[in-house]
């Protein structure tokens, strides 16, 4: 399935049905009074977050959503039928912005969460409402009220517990594939991952977490280089960042600082999230290189550095256990 994390769509709720002009027509009643019914309500436009979706690709092909008009009133004071609502299903984590792309209208960050974006128009009044002591046979009825319309932007920010970040070719896709059921494309060249990937890591029957792998970041990502500003949005909701660094590179400290700089430039709150630093591809390093690089990275970051080999899975069980503990603790804190 193709991945799409932004889409512009048009939505319009239904107009209200028209009220009608009608009079009683009964045997032996020559001058029946007014009995025109009201129009029915127009359909609403509702957005709902549902599980099982992780892309906005459907909105590339369907971009206009319109609810129906309410039914017109009828004689005998019959009200027109209300039109059915139009419910638009979107992935959990979808944000809805106004056409200016800045005004946030709704954040559907939980399964089942809904927002009524365009309310259907009210039905018009039938002539029964206009009867008075001086006007016993009113020939007036109201048209239904118009519905609401607008263009909106949808932006998907994936919901994951762990955000996997790093430069291109750091081994993120390999780690995701061995740690979860995800099967991302893997090759030994930069930018193998072209869009965010989600994987579920299940340690046992009761413990699991979701990890998001975003395409490798490059310098200037926070300003849009390589679409980095869009990709970074997918780790904003993560509780912990897993920063993967290619241990075979000569300038590992520089690479760590580059990613930290981009996180800070994009959003200081994102940079302030807890970070686990992992030196990957350690199977390609000698014991002396391992020790020296781990020490240099720990000194620069002021944090513990874990050693990992995605290829041989060295250090993987320890890393997954640490990630699960972080996720469990974060959920416990949120629950108060």
Swiss-Prot record:
GO terms for cellular component: cytoplasm. Its cofactor is Mg(2+). GTP binds at residues 166-173, 191-195, 213-216, 280-283, 309-311. Its main location: cytoplasm. Mg(2+) binds at residues 173, 193. One of its GO terms (biological process) is ribosome biogenesis. InterPro entries: G_OBG, GTP-bd, GTP-bd_Obg/CgtA, GTP1-OBG_CS, GTP1_OBG_dom, GTP1_OBG_dom_sf, OBG_GTPase, P-loop_NTPase. It comes from the Bacteria. An essential GTPase which binds GTP, GDP and possibly (p)ppGpp with moderate affinity, with high nucleotide exchange rates and a fairly low GTP hydrolysis rate. Plays a role in control of the cell cycle, stress response, ribosome biogenesis and in those bacteria that undergo differentiation, in morphogenesis control. This is GTPase Obg.
């Amino acid at each position: 399935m193709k991945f799409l994390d932004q889409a512009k769509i048009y939505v319009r709720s239904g107009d209200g049905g028209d009220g009608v002009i009608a009079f009683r027509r009964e045997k032996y009643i020559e001058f029946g009074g007014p009995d025109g019914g009201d129009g029915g309500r127009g359909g609403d436009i509702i957005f709902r977050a549902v599980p099982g979706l992780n892309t906005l690709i459907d909105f590339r092909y369907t971009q206009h959503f319109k609810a129906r008009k309410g039914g017109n009133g009828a004689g005998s004071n019959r009200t027109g039928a209300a039109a059915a609502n139009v419910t638009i299903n979107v992935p959990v984590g979808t944000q809805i912005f106004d056409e200016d792309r800045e005004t946030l209208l709704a954040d559907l960050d939980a399964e089942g969460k809904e927002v009524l974006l365009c309310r259907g128009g009210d039905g018009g009044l039938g002539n029964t409402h206009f009867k008075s002591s001086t006007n016993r046979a009113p020939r007036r009825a109201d048209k239904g009220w118009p519905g609401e319309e607008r263009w909106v932007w949808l932006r998907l920010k994936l919901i994951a517990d762990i955000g996997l970040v790093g430069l291109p070719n750091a081994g993120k896709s390999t780690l995701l594939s061995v740690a979860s059921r995800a099967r991302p494309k893997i090759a030994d060249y930069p930018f193998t991952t072209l869009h965010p990937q989600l994987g579920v890591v299940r340690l046992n029957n009761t413990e699991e977490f979701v990890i998001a792998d975003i395409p490798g970041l490059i310098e200037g990502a926070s300003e849009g280089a390589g679409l980095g500003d869009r990709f970074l949005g997918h780790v904003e909701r993560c509780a912990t960042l897993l920063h993967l660094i290619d241990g075979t590179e000569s300038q590992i400290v520089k690479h760590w600082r580059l990613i930290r700089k981009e996180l800070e430039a994009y959003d200081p709150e994102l940079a302030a999230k807890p970070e686990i630093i992992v030196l990957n591809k350690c199977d390609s390093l000698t014991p002396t290189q391992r020790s020296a690089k781990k020490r240099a990275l720990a000194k620069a970051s002021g944090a513990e550095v874990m050693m990992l080999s995605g290829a041989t899975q060295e250090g993987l069980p320890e890393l997954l256990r640490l990630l699960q503990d972080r996720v469990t603790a974060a959920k416990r804190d949120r629950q108060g």
